[in-house]
């Protein structure tokens, strides 16, 4: 069959799938033309930058139509590989800091750059967090796990190999329940969880003009960061389930404190393995699966769903033409919703060899038991418990889900509610659990983030004593009791704004200010502002001093207008003078 004939047959099949109707040969030709026009319009939309969001919607709609057409005949089978950075302060095998957004190559130890003579040393915190994840997901914790070298050449991998745990991982087995909609769940089995080191980052820049050359620069800040790779069984059916499963893992990683799992920062990256089979062939154990293809480095839930839908349709079209699906690794372009080949899997030989410089990780039964005692419940368990109508203080499901975003938030809410009930008992008033929850996940969390007084990943973890759940509970009990406050020379009942003002007094107003207003919180906030606005800082130092107003405005926004502008201005001046 000529290439032209094959292309015509493919276009004909796309037209039939899109219109869902039988046709004669003449009508089929017309349908193929319609399909090509629809496809051209969808691709054309993606080339217009001002309508990127509508183009994504068009791509999604196109994929959904094609999926629906073959829904009765074919089944899409998906497995996931998730790579999540763990929340250790330093890297897996070196003492360099793990810090997103740092200056290029600022956090690189000799081992990260593969300098001769440098040796790895395992990060105990990374081992602890990987063990916690395995315990929470019901996996078997290996008492002895081993590292090995996975060899391949890439510019952002200076060693020429990645240290990983393919054959003897720290965790085998486990499961997670995925909400697939309409009140149904699917149990997704986990093959293994392994520790491995991350690669660096390649940044490609193309010069101006039509014939501009592409320059690749390497940032090794990420190289060597500790990753947990979660490999699942092919238990998912379709793109929406794959996206829902990735979201469930993200919530779990955050809730357990294993990592922040921010896809936009690259601290959670997802690969999908996609195959198709005729409906009714094989069972859940993967029998009679078609050949699979892997799509790498998906960084949003929408991209996961779209990539799976496109791959499934591509596989069905190949089979319909009598062609074989080749096992290969592919990339995904979110602009047009299509995948493209990266490499054929048969050509790869990673030459796995034992890692001679890292001894096995040996865990005692006592160590695993201690971690199991400290491991919190999974998010779905916490949500069910908080929303259980049989309890004394059941929350609406949406509010319970917000409270269970982090284990620390759930613990804080329950401690604040308990303190509020104790404080309200002598006053003979009832405390509304939902009101406490709304304050904790709304006002309190927002103010904590603006004031930068806690961690970025878990905002209610490690708060100062003045923000303890006991104090918050007592203040909320006073609100419930209708106690009054005098502001503007007029007494009125206390409200949430008064609670916020009591918890967050004006910054730099006598709290450690000292001479020059050197309040530690203001200083830290101003340094954070300067670090987060490098372009403005460069312009400021080049003579555009009016930008000081922008820095002060950002500080006032973060403190909700309660900071003293003079104190902030002095702190910003010091921070700008320290910035190199």
Swiss-Prot record:
Keywords: ATP-binding, Chloroplast, Ligase, Mitochondrion, Nucleotide-binding, Plastid, Protein biosynthesis. SUPFAM superfamilies: GatB/YqeY motif (SSF89095), Glutamine synthetase/guanido kinase (SSF55931). HAMAP family: GatB. This protein may be expected to contain an N-terminal transit peptide but none has been predicted. This is Glutamyl-tRNA(Gln) amidotransferase subunit B-2, chloroplastic/mitochondrial. The gene is GATB-2. The keyword ATP-binding applies. Subunit of the heterotrimeric GatCAB amidotransferase (AdT) complex, composed of A, B and C subunits. Residues 20-35, 42-59 have a biased composition (Low complexity). Its EC number is 6.3.5.-. It holds the Pfam family GatB_N. GO terms for cellular component: chloroplast; glutamyl-tRNA(Gln) amidotransferase complex; mitochondrion. Its main location: mitochondrion. Allows the formation of correctly charged Gln-tRNA(Gln) through the transamidation of misacylated Glu-tRNA(Gln) in chloroplasts and mitochondria. The reaction takes place in the presence of glutamine and ATP through an activated gamma-phospho-Glu-tRNA(Gln). Residues 20-64 are annotated as: Disordered. Gene3D superfamilies: 1.10.10.410. It catalyses: L-glutamyl-tRNA(Gln) + L-glutamine + ATP + H2O = L-glutaminyl-tRNA(Gln) + L-glutamate + ADP + phosphate + H(+). One of its GO terms (molecular function) is glutaminyl-tRNA synthase (glutamine-hydrolyzing) activity. It comes from the Eukaryota. InterPro entries: Asn/Gln-tRNA_amidoTrfase_suB/E, Asn/Gln-tRNA_Trfase_suB/E_cat, Asn/Gln_amidotransferase, Asn/Gln_tRNA_amidoTrase-B-like, GatB, GatB_Yqey_C_2, Gln-tRNA_amidoTrfase_suB_CS, Gln_synth/guanido_kin_cat_dom. It is found in: Mitochondrion; Plastid, Chloroplast. Belongs to the GatB/GatE family. GatB subfamily.
